């Protein structure tokens, strides 16, 4: 079989592929699109296809488990392996939508350390294997702001000091945490406060202060475009998307790390996946030490394996050290919040309902 990407993927610059069933032996890999999918294509997909002779259909989605659930419950599974957030991996596993994965099948570190000891603690779950540590941050266009520049999460909510539109993802996740941080809640107390009705009210009250100035986004490629088009003066975003726009496209974008919400993404394999064995082989290959290090040269997301970190070098431009660009860099972690997957697995539905009602109000 050809060891090249499907023409649909190339033609759409890693956009959403046509929703047609994959041909036999063609692995369907689903991820978030844009610079992130490109990093996976370069570090995982192309080398795996060259090694195995298989082809890959690469599709994009906007997260969540709704599409996974619909396919599995209908008995019409066309996706094989999907990149998900940790809370979604836990929910999908609990609902029997994805298969358990034994960490013993994963590649050991180059020095022989078993994978279970090489992955960063908390990055292996019953049904998921992590690839990267990523972060939701906010960013601004340096050419559009005169004088003092934003430096704290409070500045994002300060329309008087920094007038103009804000971009935010159309979801309660991260937005509620940002709101509480900006309202003075210490990073270590965010989820304790948010677990109470009073905490939820407090977060929405803070969001109320900028609601009329928010442009909502859903796909990860949108925030850099919103900044580039001048539709917003600052926006929440995935750190890797902003880095790619700045380092790869020379955009004058700056990341504010204060108050970042960091998380991990994992591979899960759908129950009933038409190419289960190929999916398992791809998962093993793409979570090896070298593959994870290779991805980090394409985008500023930290590898989930300890043994990968020393192998991370320069960005593709050959002049940008990737270490300081990672969410896990010490300077970037000073006021960081780790996404609490248990909280979101338990409260996602009710907070989605509350958030949607708030949007409509």
Where does each model-flagged region fall?
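Mature extracytoplasmic/periplasmic domains
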Residues: 270-335
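Early extracytoplasmic/lumenal segment of secretory-pathway proteins
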Residues: 25-92
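Periplasmic-binding protein-like
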Residues: 200-209, 247-273, 316-317
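Conserved C-terminal helix/tail region of periplasmic/extracytoplasmic solute-binding proteins
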Residues: 331-361
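A ligand-binding cleft/hinge motif common to bilobed small-molecule-binding domains
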Residues: 89-91, 234-251
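Extracytoplasmic ligand-binding site segments that recognize negatively charged/polar headgroups
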Residues: 34-39, 84-224, 228
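Gram-negative bacterial Sec-dependent N-terminal signal peptides
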Residues: 1-23
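A bilobed periplasmic-binding-protein/Venus flytrap-type ligand-binding module shared by bacterial periplasmic
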Residues: 137-144, 180-182, 264-276, 294-297
